[in-house]
């Protein structure tokens, strides 16, 4: 198991390119199951979750070709089975996204209940209730969702009980080949939902309203193949901007959609950053100043994403002043707090709130990642800690960040990846000399 070793205290400076969005490419890969012709996808991030989704499609019979630029051709014309095994689904919650397209195109699906990050209850009730409203028969048997439909799914008016990104995406895909019109109320508005709709529309779907809380899908008989480029990852972009702010640096991120970063940029400006925006870039300069503490309340888009909560917590623990972070999207998403406290952070938890008093510096320590975004927060904290910070269980971070140590090193950070057996050997050697 790999670890990251970080020597803190270096301001980040320079320019990096932002990768394609993990939360956009996964539903779009699942959506290729709706299409009988080859699809070429570009701007694909090299991530463990993407590899898992590709393997899942491959086991179903999809023919997949990857070139040296990480463009992917997916041909789902010869799908042989509609079974998504527990072995793969347990590692990634987004695997549930194959349910809608399998059911819509093939009239049946067997999908294991998902796994993924341990950050609270994220039930699939919205997915199942929506599929049933579209005419599917669904049973839960031995940890699997067994879904069937006679003929085609039928369009319906759906009122989602809670805002859910994957639930909205799954129901969009299910409705794309359904008979008649489907209207989704209380739909998620995230840019990744819009990207899925844009992709499907380019392949021949008839979807309107994506980006609002009411999405209308007029079902079509079939989709055609084509090519599509995945939108940039706003969470990766936000992570590097926060890293620059908390290290008092000056960083430009390229190949981004600044309009998707509104809430993040607003808080970074409030923290004292000078922010400039271009068509596809953002420039952040702290001019050597310490960041000011900022209150954060997570909420669905266009408000502050819950996936940026841990990063802003890392900023606040070394910022000037006090801040309150309120988590409204997921329960149990403060598991990184105890690890930050090991580094000297002054954080007190009160239910869904974290009360933070900023310190000038943290102290490096061994810490353990508990989920994808928590691991990013710990890496950022390590950038401002005295001495060495060792982040363990970084397989979490590899699920959502492409080459994070290389990009941070490109900006001047002292960071390296080592395998556990190499680290253990070095630690043992050091002890012999003590």
Curated annotation (Swiss-Prot):
<dbReference type="InterPro" id="IPR036968">
    <property type="entry name" value="Enolpyruvate_Tfrase_sf"/>
</dbReference>
<dbReference type="GO" id="GO:0008760">
    <property type="term" value="F:UDP-N-acetylglucosamine 1-carboxyvinyltransferase activity"/>
</dbReference>
<comment type="function">
    <text>Cell wall formation. Adds enolpyruvyl to UDP-N-acetylglucosamine.</text>
</comment>
<dbReference type="InterPro" id="IPR005750">
    <property type="entry name" value="UDP_GlcNAc_COvinyl_MurA"/>
</dbReference>
<dbReference type="GO" id="GO:0019277">
    <property type="term" value="P:UDP-N-acetylgalactosamine biosynthetic process"/>
</dbReference>
<keyword id="KW-0573">Peptidoglycan synthesis</keyword>
<keyword id="KW-0808">Transferase</keyword>
<keyword id="KW-0670">Pyruvate</keyword>
<feature type="modified residue" description="2-(S-cysteinyl)pyruvic acid O-phosphothioketal">
    <location>
        <position position="117"/>
    </location>
</feature>
<keyword id="KW-0132">Cell division</keyword>
<dbReference type="GO" id="GO:0005737">
    <property type="term" value="C:cytoplasm"/>
</dbReference>
<feature type="binding site">
    <location>
        <position position="307"/>
    </location>
    <ligand>
        <name>UDP-N-acetyl-alpha-D-glucosamine</name>
    </ligand>
</feature>
<keyword id="KW-0133">Cell shape</keyword>
<dbReference type="GO" id="GO:0008360">
    <property type="term" value="P:regulation of cell shape"/>
</dbReference>
<dbReference type="InterPro" id="IPR001986">
    <property type="entry name" value="Enolpyruvate_Tfrase_dom"/>
</dbReference>
<feature type="binding site">
    <location>
        <position position="329"/>
    </location>
    <ligand>
        <name>UDP-N-acetyl-alpha-D-glucosamine</name>
    </ligand>
</feature>
<keyword id="KW-0131">Cell cycle</keyword>
<comment type="similarity">
    <text>Belongs to the EPSP synthase family. MurA subfamily.</text>
</comment>
<keyword id="KW-0961">Cell wall biogenesis/degradation</keyword>
<dbReference type="GO" id="GO:0071555">
    <property type="term" value="P:cell wall organization"/>
</dbReference>
<dbReference type="GO" id="GO:0009252">
    <property type="term" value="P:peptidoglycan biosynthetic process"/>
</dbReference>
<comment type="pathway">
    <text>Cell wall biogenesis; peptidoglycan biosynthesis.</text>
</comment>
<dbReference type="InterPro" id="IPR050068">
    <property type="entry name" value="MurA_subfamily"/>
</dbReference>
<dbReference type="Pfam" id="PF00275">
    <property type="entry name" value="EPSP_synthase"/>
</dbReference>
<keyword id="KW-0963">Cytoplasm</keyword>
<dbReference type="InterPro" id="IPR013792">
    <property type="entry name" value="RNA3'P_cycl/enolpyr_Trfase_a/b"/>
</dbReference>
<protein>
    <recommendedName>
        <fullName>UDP-N-acetylglucosamine 1-carboxyvinyltransferase</fullName>
        <ecNumber>2.5.1.7</ecNumber>
    </recommendedName>
</protein>
<feature type="binding site">
    <location>
        <begin position="22"/>
        <end position="23"/>
    </location>
    <ligand>
        <name>phosphoenolpyruvate</name>
    </ligand>
</feature>
<feature type="binding site">
    <location>
        <position position="93"/>
    </location>
    <ligand>
        <name>UDP-N-acetyl-alpha-D-glucosamine</name>
    </ligand>
</feature>
<dbReference type="GO" id="GO:0051301">
    <property type="term" value="P:cell division"/>
</dbReference>
<feature type="active site" description="Proton donor">
    <location>
        <position position="117"/>
    </location>
</feature>
């Amino acid at each position: 198991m790999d670890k990251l070793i970080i020597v803190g205290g270096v301001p980040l400076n320079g320019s990096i390119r932002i990768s394609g969005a993990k939360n956009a490419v996964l539903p779009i890969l699942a959506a290729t199951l709706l299409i009988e012709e080859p699809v070429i996808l570009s701007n694909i991030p090299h991530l463990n979750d993407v590899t898992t989704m590709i393997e899942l499609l491959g086991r179903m019979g999809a023919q997949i070709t990857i070139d040296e630029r990480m463009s992917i051709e997916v041909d789902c014309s010869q799908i042989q089975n509609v079974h998504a095994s527990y072995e793969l689904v347990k590692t990634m919650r987004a695997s549930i996204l194959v349910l809608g397209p399998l059911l819509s195109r093939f009239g049946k699906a067997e999908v294991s209940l998902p796994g993924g990050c341990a950050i609270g209850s994220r039930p699939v009730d919205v997915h199942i209730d929506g599929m049933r409203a579209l005419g599917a028969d669904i049973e839960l048997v031995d940890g699997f969702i067994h879904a069937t439909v006679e003929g085609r799914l039928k369009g319906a008016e759906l009122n989602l009980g809670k805002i859910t990104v994957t639930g909205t995406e799954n129901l969009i895909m299910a409705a794309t080949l359904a008979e008649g019109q489907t209207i989704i109320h209380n739909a998620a508005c995230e840019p990744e939902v819009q990207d899925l709709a844009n992709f499907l529309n380019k392949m021949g779907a008839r979807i309107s309203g994506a980006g609002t809380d009411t999405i209308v899908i007029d079902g079509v008989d079939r989709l055609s193949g084509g090519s599509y480029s995945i939108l940039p990852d706003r969470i990766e972009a936000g992570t590097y901007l926060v890293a620059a702010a908390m290290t008092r640096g000056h960083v430009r991120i390229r190949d981004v959609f600044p309009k998707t970063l509104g809430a993040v940029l607003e808080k970074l400006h409030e923290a004292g950053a000078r922010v400039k925006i271009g068509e596809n870039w953002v420039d952040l300069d702290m001019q050597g100043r310490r960041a000011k503490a900022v209150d954060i309340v997570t909420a669905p888009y266009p408000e502050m994403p819950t996936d940026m909560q841990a990063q802003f917590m890392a900023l606040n623990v070394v910022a000037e002043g006090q801040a309150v972070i309120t988590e409204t999207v997921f329960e149990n998403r403060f598991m990184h707090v105890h690890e930050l406290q090991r580094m000297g952070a002054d954080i007190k938890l009160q239910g869904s709130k974290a009360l933070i008093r900023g310190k000038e510096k943290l102290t490096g320590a061994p810490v353990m990642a508990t989920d994808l975004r928590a691991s990013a927060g710990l890496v950022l904290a390590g950038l401002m800690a005295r001495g060495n910070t060792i982040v363990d269980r970084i397989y979490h971070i590899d699920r959502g960040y492409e080459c994070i140590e290389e990009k941070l090193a490109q900006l001047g950070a002292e960071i390296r990846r080592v395998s556990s057996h190499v680290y253990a050997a070095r630690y043992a050697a050091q002890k012999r000399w003590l």
